[in-house]
């Protein structure tokens, strides 16, 4: 994670996916935890032989995982929740155990890199084995982890540097990683279809739709920071219609850094000239508060203000 490069600083993390949020808590929360306890529990989990069925085996056996591994995953995930509810483990220890389980699942999953489909008729050669997470021992005590819509959170925080890594095409993350999200949340929802997906309506991102440009503009406009660093994969000529540099330039001076990048593909596409791009915006220090008129009429010029404001008198404190 990018946040690991700033481990001695105050870090604020956010992700709408609970499966990512819980990993952030594991790695970056400052809550004290017992490493000895976590090691003991993970050792017990690795030695388990489960023969009773549960939510995982009832819904996912012999799809992404074998029947035995599904039984084990389901038992472990429920046991983590039981231990937490009984007060035997704290929130950080719970996060570490769930993170260990999610990483172990993803390492052996019968997929082609995501959970939109599984390979049928294969032998399950790899089996579940949990490892002990090793977070940095001296994280900043003021770290905060959020599980929110970024556009709702951004106006509420201030930072020196804000790093943004939004979706860059129409592929919803919650579709590609639904199973990990399901296990992380552990609400045991009904699943459907060949891919055994849960209802993901609440997790859908505007950044994967035609609303992406407006969502991105609103996000950048609401950010209070000295620097904004945006990671964006241009997917050659696909999906890069957000005019990132233009939108960021309304906030300050923009520099663009590019590096060739090999995109993941399921074989249905051959994307060439793919690049990972970093947009660094050095934000203007001054803040201009612009309040749109309550009278929403056809001739309104609110969207043109970024072009008009530079022409206004510099000594004007309030313009109506």
Write out the residue ranges for each language-model feature:
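Class I S-adenosyl-L-methionine-dependent methyltransferase module
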Residues: 10-12, 16-137, 174-209, 214
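Conserved SAM/SAH-binding loop
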Residues: 147-152
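Conserved Class I SAM-dependent methyltransferase catalytic core
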Residues: 205-255, 259
